[in-house]
Amino acid sequence: MEGSMGVSAHQRFDLRTACDWWAVFRLAVMTAVPLAFAAGSVQGQDPHVPGLIPNGDVAQGNIGASDATAATIGTHPLEPALELAQRGLVQLKSTIKDYSCTVVKRERIDGKLGEHEYLFAKVRHEPFSVYLYFLAPEAMKGQEVIFVDGHNDGNMLAHAGSGVRAMVGTVSLKPNGALAMQGNRYAITEIGVENLAKRLVEVAEHDKQFGECDVNFYPNAKVNGRICTCVQVVHPVPRRNFRFHLARVFIDDEFLIPIRYEAYDWPHEEGGQPVLMEEYTYMNVKINNGFTDADFDPKNT
């Protein structure tokens, strides 16, 4: 990170004294996949619904609702979507070793929908490695984050871009700790198109046990110029064991990877519109760059 991420003993930051600084800095560590790390349970989230609970808001429109009934005999509407997701995941695992991209995310946390955040990302699948550089908004520009599975005692390294914040130096944080999760729905360990594909399969396998599910396919959709198949899933009736009211997944037709995901809560008032909970887009994806350990070395990035 332009030499800024090398960590010496005197640079390590005592997190016990970090609270006041963190309230100002609020280093936003991004993840783009729709499932997360957070301790405890959240009101409205059935503990049997698959996936980790997001930090912040889960669906509110199904609080106090009953469970969906079991699906009737026959082909479930989700089966074609599940087959497409499974096929894409198999192809991804066998053909994509790493990629770079621009990530655009927007999340609702504590009832407030945040602004769009833009990040440049490098991701390697084995061992799982992530480098993030924040492009926008201006308050986050220049911030950098590195995570490599099995390195740095399982922690991520974060550094501010410039100004007073950069004087703090490099911070080593638990990926799913309270400080790293502040302002984020998901941990950095859940970022990436492979993690997104896995979670989509998990949720689809869960939801196809039940009825009250409408699925539509929209071919030739476009995301930043890429031709995609859009899969839209709607649970029309609020039910405790569903994660969302409406979700759209855009599958890149060439790579068979999900490059955009958006999820909505049920309307919070009668006659209201679905409420956006989260959206993530992977743009300018360049696969198989041959990334090595050097690409995720804090002294080199």
Model regions: which residues?
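Residue-level detector of bioactive/disordered segments in secreted/extracellular proteins
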Residues: W21-V24, V103
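N-terminal mature ectodomain segment of secretory-pathway/periplasmic proteins
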Residues: H76-V164
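Compositionally biased, proline/threonine/alanine/serine-rich low-complexity intrinsically disordered stretches
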Residues: V42-H76
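Gly/Pro-enriched, hydrophobic low-complexity segments
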Residues: D110, L135, L157-A160, A166-M167, ...
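Bacterial N-terminal signal peptides
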Residues: T17, V24-A38
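Short secondary-structure junctions and interdomain/linker hinges
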Residues: L35, T95-Y99, D207
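N-terminal secretory signal peptides that target proteins for export/translocation
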Residues: M1-W22
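Residue-identity detector for glycine
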Residues: G3-G6, G40, G44
